[in-house]
């Protein structure tokens, strides 16, 4: 099998993957559940449910999985999921951790692939086992001990990729919250290079910093962030793969905001004129709605039909004196809530 285009870039476009499928020059891995895979998958894809890898993610186990899937050291690999890239990111990282060089994320989910009208199949390819060595890549992994040692270093940035309320409730001291949903753009699992660079710049994160990402437990959401950073050429990125669950179980220090609630999320709202570029579409927002001005009764009625959250409604709107940081309004005046 030949190497993929742009081997240093961890993302492959759906257009290029289609060409590689026709050439039969690539190993494609679908990390959805088996029953989902059986109902239809990208042509020539083999199945690796993420749970199988997470059940034992030791280097030896990852090596065996790779070999059983017909992956040798030289095999070009593309991985996809139907979960905004988080599950596939974790598998890409695992292969890179044992030293596999040519492995990439597909830039769309399976659903997006289908929406593009691209070919799918229910045929299961035959797999010829291969031989794969293990050459651990320690530079891409952070442990709890390492994180505790470097978290006070000014050249180290820790990013928490959980949803903001989880972050507010408790997080690793000094961590900056970049929720995983802010990493995507319309029709793709990740922002454009320019969009990602703008996000980092506006959060005050220098591109020459050492960046460590973490999430809740197994490194899926933070794995997506890891590759978002690598996709724009950030050289020194590590994944704290066992993430906050391990950190808390080890009784490491944590920071938290007492009595955190949904109003504390206001700092994550974006100006409506920018919303298509920086956030998911409004129908996907589950806990509120951003408006350019105080909502009319008609607008409230529309929202009640659109964005329920446990039977309660929250709207945030801008006044003239709202400060904007990274397109995020910091609410200074009114906050409306409707039951």
Predicted regions and their residues:
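Extended hydrophobic/aromatic segments used for targeting, binding, or gating
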Residues: 194-195, 236-241, 245-264
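Extended interaction-bearing regions that mediate binding to partners or small molecules
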Residues: 288-339
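Short loop/helix-cap segments at secondary-structure boundaries that form the rim of catalytic
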Residues: 37-43, 167-173
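Short hydrophobic beta-strand that contains or immediately precedes a catalytic carboxylate
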Residues: 17, 25-32, 48, 155-162
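Active-site neighborhoods of enzymes that stabilize oxyanions during catalysis
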Residues: 2-13, 111-169, 176, 251-287, ...
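His/Asp/Glu-enriched short active-site or ligand-binding loop at hydrolase and phosphoryl-transfer sites
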Residues: 179-185
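Thiolate-centered catalytic microenvironments shared by cysteine-dependent enzyme domains
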Residues: 2-8, 53-145, 210, 215-245
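A short, acidic, amphipathic alpha-helical segment used as a generic capping/interface helix at domain edges
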Residues: 192-205
């Amino acid at each position: 099998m030949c190497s993929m285009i742009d081997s240093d870039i961890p993302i492959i476009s759906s257009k290029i993957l289609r060409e590689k499928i026709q050439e039969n020059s690539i190993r494609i891995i679908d990390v959805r559940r088996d029953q989902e895979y059986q109902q239809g998958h990208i042509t020539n894809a083999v199945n690796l449910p993420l749970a199988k890898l997470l059940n034992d993610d030791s280097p030896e186990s990852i090596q065996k999985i790779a070999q059983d899937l017909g992956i040798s050291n030289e095999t070009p690999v593309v991985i996809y999921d139907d979960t905004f890239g988080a599950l596939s990111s974790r598998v890409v990282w695992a292969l890179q951790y044992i030293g596999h060089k040519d492995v990439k994320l597909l830039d769309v989910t399976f659903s997006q692939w289908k929406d593009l009208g691209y070919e799918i199949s229910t045929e299961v390819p035959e797999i010829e086992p291969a031989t794969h060595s293990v050459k651990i890549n320690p530079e891409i992994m952070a442990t709890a001990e390492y994180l505790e040692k470097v978290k006070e270093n000014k050249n180290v940035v820790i990013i928490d990729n959980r949803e903001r309320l989880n972050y507010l409730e408790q997080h690793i001291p000094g961590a900056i919250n970049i929720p995983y949903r802010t990493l995507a753009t319309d029709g793709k699992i990740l922002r454009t290079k320019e969009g990602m660079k703008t996000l980092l710049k506006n959060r005050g994160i220098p591109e020459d910093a050492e960046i460590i990402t973490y999430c809740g437990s197994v490194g899926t959401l933070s794995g997506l962030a890891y590759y978002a950073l690598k996709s724009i050429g950030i050289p020194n990125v590590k994944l704290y793969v066992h993430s906050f669950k391990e950190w808390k179980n080890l009784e490491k220090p944590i920071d938290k905001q007492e009595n955190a609630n949904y109003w504390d999320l206001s700092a994550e709202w974006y100006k409506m004129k920018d919303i298509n570029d920086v956030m998911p579409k409004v129908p996907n927002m589950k806990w509120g709605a951003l408006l350019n001005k105080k909502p009319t009764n008609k607008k409230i009625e529309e929202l009640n039909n659109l964005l329920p959250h446990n039977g309660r409604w929250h709207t945030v709107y801008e006044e003239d004196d709202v400060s904007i940081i990274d397109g995020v309004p910091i609410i200074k005046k009114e906050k409306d809530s409707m039951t």
